[in-house]
Amino acid sequence: MFDREQEKAMSARNDEEELDNVNRRSVLLGTSSLVAAAALTSSALAQTQKAATPSAASSGGTTGSKPNILFIMGDDIGWYNVSAYNMGIMGYRTPNIDRIGREGAVFTDWYGQQSCTAGRAAFITGQTPVRTGLTKVGLPGAELGLGPLDPSVADVLKNHGYATGQFGKNHLGDRDEHLPTAHGFDEFFGNLYHLNAEEEPENPDYPKDPEFRKRFGPRGVIKSSADGKIENTGPLTTRRMETIDAEFLDGAKDFINRQHRANKPWFCYFNSTRMHIFTHLKAASQGKTGLGIYPDGMVEHDGMVGELLKLVDELGVANNTIVVYTTDNGAEVFTWPDGGTTPFKGEKATNWEGGFRVPCLIKWPGVIKPGTVVNDICAHEDFIPTFAAANGDTDLVERLKKGSTLNGKTFKVHLDGYNLLPFLKGDAKESSRKEFLYWSDDGDLMGLRVSQWKVAFMEQHTEVNPKTPLGVWQGNFTKLRAPMLYDLRADPFERGSTSMYYGDWVARRLFLIVPAQAIVAKYIESFKEFPPRAKAASFTINDVMEKISTGSPGKN
């Protein structure tokens, strides 16, 4: 059952009601796949290591001024592809990424999402992606993208006087209205999709009709600004892929230098295209490790992280700059050797920990003690409330529920993130986040974690074979009549279900079911006032048939 502190945390997160006020008997088994499948409780957990009280505490840095924010996001990089996590077992090192954790914190239980678009949407909006509809990987020509009713992290920071720039992959929509510069960023220079979509026009059998390319093909690498200017700098060809991250790096460094000269606090969001398939390396990066294309690409990627850290040092602003390194989703394993590595079960696009658990390292001078290891649950949705709190805005989540103005625009939304600042500073013993919900790219609730307990009520075991050559991307999820239960402390890699004693172990823990239903019901309750902005996209004919039956127009 739930201890009182966890009940209070859950209640404060969702609404003003106490968890005990939920009429558990009114939560009927079988009335909703979201509720009926949930079987979990928040048993108290003593974390092994906490973020310690810093030597020079302040609301957001050592100087008391607004902290700069350097946010670096990799692409499809596995938990074990960063040497701070693998301790060298992969045969190569990532010293610059590791440095962020050494001078700050390494997080073991940080959650992205199950795919590129979803993971980036969770960070940018502070909402679980099912609310925005951005759960499915965005494709060229698709209608769905980041909408005008959802505030972005850039909107939040613009409200506090920041200069905002994004460089590299976006993947939150194909159209002009989806570009970062329509959502709070002063400038953007980057690509809009995953790499394998960018190179499709180079296939010899790609349609030659220019109208097809115009309607369904990838746009080029875009340079845009908040004043409405949009420039297509040309296609992202396989040759350009060899050096495109260097282009983005130059743009990011130029942005930081300009804002430093202007004496403005800055938020730089750098999105590497490494290590999404298909990897194309310049000659100088090939063979660096002797271990293959992925390790070589990681070493190149780590070097670019090092260049950004070096610039921050040279400008003398390291003590007032938050540095974050993370990635969007779990490793894509089935494309190995051009694919990532994770010790967790599953991979990108699955319901398992391997699909959602991501590396995350944060350096925050004056807030996070160097060398910290954090085992508490945290997620990409938590960045917006935390960055707001770093600027003295501690009630953003509640204010946006009632309606609030950010960057000259009025929003009324339900943020799903938590303010982690009190925990990171050492003022709170535990992370505010006690739970995480696992949504599929189709918008189904696949599982729930509270404290160390996890339930999986959908599962996927698809391997690459002649019937499903694209592995997990083609295989269906199986809905379970009775959920599977895991203790992610005793069994973090979800292998307990292979034990001959697993059935007995689960049978002794059926007391967890009803409290879990209460949590899910309370979460779903928020959708009454804050319904999803859009339905998740589909790769199948179902979406087309639904549009035909409802008379929904297609893309013009």
Regions found by a protein language model. Name each.
Residues 2, 11-479, 483, 492-556:
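Formylglycine-dependent sulfatase
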